[in-house]
Amino acid sequence: MGSAGLSRLHGLFAVYKPPGLKWKHLRDTVELQLLKGLNARKPPAPKQRVRFLLGPMEGSEEKELTLTATSVPSFINHPLVCGPAFAHLKVGVGHRLDAQASGVLVLGVGHGCRLLTDMYNAHLTKDYTVRGLLGKATDDFREDGRLVEKTTYDHVTREKLDRILAVIQGSHQKALVMYSNLDLKTQEAYEMAVRGLIRPMNKSPMLITGIRCLYFAPPEFLLEVQCMHETQKELRKLVHEIGLELKTTAVCTQVRRTRDGFFTLDSALLRTQWDLTNIQDAIRAATPQVAAELEKSLSPGLDTKQLPSPGWSWDSQGPSSTLGLERGAGQ
């Protein structure tokens, strides 16, 4: 029964990582729960083996002993003899989240760990909600960091913030095209852009493909960011630099991933669901979509030509900061 359960564990699934929990601790917890589930299954009936037992002959009044062939159960594979059937599982982690961040975290079990590499090579976008707080700056861009400056923010308006976000998105879209090595003059590049298939060819700095403000009530604001190749620290730095562009300061109070590629919050398992049955069901439900999305993302696209020169007005190495802006732009 345990082997049958293991065969249904190969694949990808998503969990919801709460803030304050390190990704490695989460991975170890999931592995432990899976091992408990596999080892809790009823062991198969012991195999019978033939043994020759010494005993008196049947129907004989004499005390002469003889060997008699007898079928007895073999306990050589019983858990009480050899220990648990499963002592280790291969559990891999996709795009990681640091301890302070929360949200969708993709895990792979068994052969599913190879699919994590495919997800990385597909350069899929991820969605975040990022909360900011105007009026102060810290050494690590987090609210609980060491305070280095306090400023006023009465002059900040929703219109000014939206203007800054539009400039950010425009500069990063140019960078996305540059790192994709596409010739913008070709029909193939246009069709790929329409289909949303433009991706960097290799590793690149953080690229923002979409950003907007969901909530603005100074000093608090909430951003929705769609990006790739990011770290959570870079997203916190983004909030800091937005504050500078607004002629004030800002710190990040929350980073929450709401989508990682084709995995969303709806498909992420809560902490109370990190058990064998729920994870098997999640892997089975995700398998068709994983296969379809990876095939679409990794399949050779339209023929493209490499640009000899990006031709942009800013540095050919990409934006020099998270914003890719000159100081004071967008005001």
From Swiss-Prot:
Keyword Mitochondrion belongs to the record: yes
InterPro entries per record: PsdUridine_synth_cat_dom_sf, PsdUridine_synth_N, Trub2
Do the record's keywords include Isomerase?
yes
Q: Could you tell me which Gene3D superfamilies the record lists for this protein?
A: Pseudouridine synthase
- Coiled-coil region(s): none
Q: Which UniProt keywords apply?
A: Isomerase, Mitochondrion, mRNA processing, Transit peptide, tRNA processing
Q: Which domain of life is it from?
A: Eukaryota
- Targeting signal (transit peptide) range: 1-10
Pfam families, alphabetized: TruB_N
Q: Where is the composition biased (Polar residues)?
A: 314-323
Active-site residue list: 98 (nucleophile)
BP GO terms, sorted: mRNA processing; mRNA pseudouridine synthesis; positive regulation of mitochondrial translation; tRNA processing
Substrates-to-products reaction catalysed: a uridine in mRNA = a pseudouridine in mRNA; uridine(55) in tRNA = pseudouridine(55) in tRNA
Q: Which GO terms describe its molecular function?
A: pseudouridine synthase activity; RNA binding; tRNA pseudouridine(55) synthase activity
Map out region (Disordered) in residue numbers. 296-331
State a GO cellular component annotated for this protein.
mitochondrion
Q: Where in the cell is it found?
A: Mitochondrion matrix
Documented EC number(s)? 5.4.99.-, 5.4.99.25
State the function annotated in the UniProt record.
Answer: Minor enzyme contributing to the isomerization of uridine to pseudouridine (pseudouridylation) of specific mitochondrial mRNAs (mt-mRNAs) such as COXI and COXIII mt-mRNAs. As a component of a functional protein-RNA module, consisting of RCC1L, NGRN, RPUSD3, RPUSD4, TRUB2, FASTKD2 and 16S mitochondrial ribosomal RNA (16S mt-rRNA), controls 16S mt-rRNA abundance and is required for intra-mitochondrial translation. Also catalyzes pseudouridylation of some tRNAs, including synthesis of pseudouridine(55) from uracil-55, in the psi GC loop of a subset of tRNAs.
User: Which family does the UniProt entry place this protein in?
Assistant: Belongs to the pseudouridine synthase TruB family.
How the protein assembles, per its UniProt entry? Forms a regulatory protein-RNA complex, consisting of RCC1L, NGRN, RPUSD3, RPUSD4, TRUB2, FASTKD2 and 16S mt-rRNA.
Record protein name field: Pseudouridylate synthase TRUB2, mitochondrial
Q: What is the lineage of its organism?
A: Eukaryota, Metazoa, Chordata, Craniata, Vertebrata
